[in-house]
Amino acid sequence: PLCLETIALYSAVDREGKRVVDLGCGEGRDVIQFAREGYEAVGIDISARGLKKAEAWAKKENIVISTIQSDLVSFRLGEEFDVVYSSGTLTYLPQDVRRAVFSNYKRFTRQGGLNAFNVFVEKPFLETPPDWGIDEHFYISGELLTYYWDWEIVRFEERILDCNSGGVPHKHAMDVMIARRV
């Protein structure tokens, strides 16, 4: 998974004191994993219920995380992080706000820090997933790279994944990118 791959880019010693923000953390799977690995971890999500579950899970494991309830469209970073991370939730950003949002993420990433994202990509040969919401927006292939042309691209891949969300078998196309501020 992208979370573990991102964690592996810093040695255990280098992780101490590093800050990560998980944009769209849901019920906390990845933000808790980052905290387990020594990061100061902050989770952002629109769902109060999801954040409460993340906080309860962290407490049960004796792990400290911070949470902020916000939608991703209006949320902007206001402090620096070593890792800005999101898995599958940047699809809620409409195309017209993306440039400004990614500029904000870049501005508040520390020198040498990482932005690690995966986003759903529209492909004409794949049907729209059955559980795709009206507030979800596809990216085009390689779009993430256009926002990070001035950073080191550590990894970029496009893949097609089998999925069974909503109980209906289907496929997703996804771009995965890890970029480093140099």
What do these predicted regions represent?
Residues 88-89:
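Short catalytic micro-motifs in class I SAM-dependent methyltransferases
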Residues 1-17, 21, 26-76, 95-100, ...:
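Class I (Rossmann-like) S-adenosyl-L-methionine-dependent methyltransferase catalytic domain
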Residues 85:
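A conserved beta-strand element that flanks and buttresses the S-adenosyl-L-methionine
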Residues 94, 109-110:
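Helix-to-beta-strand junctions that scaffold the AdoMet/dcAdoMet cofactor pocket
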